[in-house]
Structures are given as C-alpha cells and as structure tokens.
C-alpha cells in the first residue's frame, strides 16, 4: 500500500489471487473491487488495509457463458456488471451487486437487446469478422448511469465515429459527441 503522505510503499496482508484479473478495478463503498470471468472477485478493504476474496454467484434467467466482461462500474452508489448473453454481443445482461443476509450477490437487473440500434447505427456491427475468433460488435460500453431520484437508467456507448446514450426509461437515444 502506498502512503502519499509519507511517500513510501509497504506490504499488506497477502492473499492467493491467481484467479483474479487486476485490471479495471472500481471504487465502491470506500473499497476497491476487481472482477474476473471465473466466478471470483476481490475487494481491497481500504480502512483495514486487507485484500478479501469474494466468491459470488451470478443468477440469470438463462445463464450461458458468452464472451467476457463488457462493463464493470459504479453509478449512483450501485456497483454494476454487464456482459453479453449471446455469442453476437447484442443481448446484454446487467447485474447489480447487493447485500443479502450478510452476503454479497450479483443480482440480475436487466436484459437488453441492442439489435434495434443497428438500424440507426449500422456501424455497431463490423462489416467483416471471423466468427471463430471475433465478435461482430464494433462498439464499447463506456458508462452505465443510474439516477434514482430522476428514475433514469442510461447506457453510454462508444461507436467508431460518435458517442451515444440510450435512456432505458423513456426509450430515447441521444448523440452526445462526434469522435
């Protein structure tokens, strides 16, 4: 752990974390969280300076493993995880980490089909790809915003030439920027 006040590094308690992929960690409720595609995650408890393993179960209506993790982030005090639910990446499942009986669980929140967006934004699909090694999707999820007060849920998507937002509640699209 690094102390910016003292300018020194020091060791904290060790934990075997071979299954963990330390990229794209997210700060949530004062702790740092990492997720891996192997049903394993970890949390660095900042106040106790301790790395804790978190085993979790992802409950989905139709659990199938397709592709990797597409988004892991915090919004409105909630921690979200988004991943594809079919091999072409246009059907997405959204999960929220919640505390249930002193146990953290990923609970299914939304099932979203982005296929209708390809009519307005055909650049969401690659013109050429090898289905053996590649996904046809040509977009990235760069944000998932939840506003509990306004009851708004918005997905922010980066395309090759623009950034768009999709409001789930009133089913509207907005072009945020040309890239």
Task: Please annotate each region the language model reported.
Residues 1-179:
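Short, conserved recognition motifs on repeat-domain binding surfaces
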């Amino acid at each position: 752990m690094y102390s910016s006040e003292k300018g020194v590094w020091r060791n904290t308690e060790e934990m075997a974390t071979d299954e963990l992929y330390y990229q794209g960690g997210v700060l949530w409720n004062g702790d740092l969280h990492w997720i891996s595609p192997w049903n394993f995650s970890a949390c660095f408890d900042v106040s106790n300076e301790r790395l804790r393993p978190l085993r979790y179960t992802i409950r989905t209506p139709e659990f199938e493993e397709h592709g990797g993790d597409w988004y892991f982030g915090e919004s409105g005090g909630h921690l979200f995880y988004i991943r594809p639910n079919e091999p072409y990446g246009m059907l997405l499942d959204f999960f929220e980490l919640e505390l249930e009986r002193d146990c953290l669980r990923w609970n299914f929140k939304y099932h979203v089909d982005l296929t209708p967006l390809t009519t307005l934004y055909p650049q969401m699909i690659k013109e050429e790809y090898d289905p053996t090694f590649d996904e046809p999707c040509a977009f990235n999820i760069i944000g998932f915003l939840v506003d509990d007060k306004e009851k708004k849920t918005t997905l922010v998507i980066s395309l090759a030439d623009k950034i768009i937002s999709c409001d789930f509640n009133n089913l509207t699209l907005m072009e945020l920027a040309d890239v």
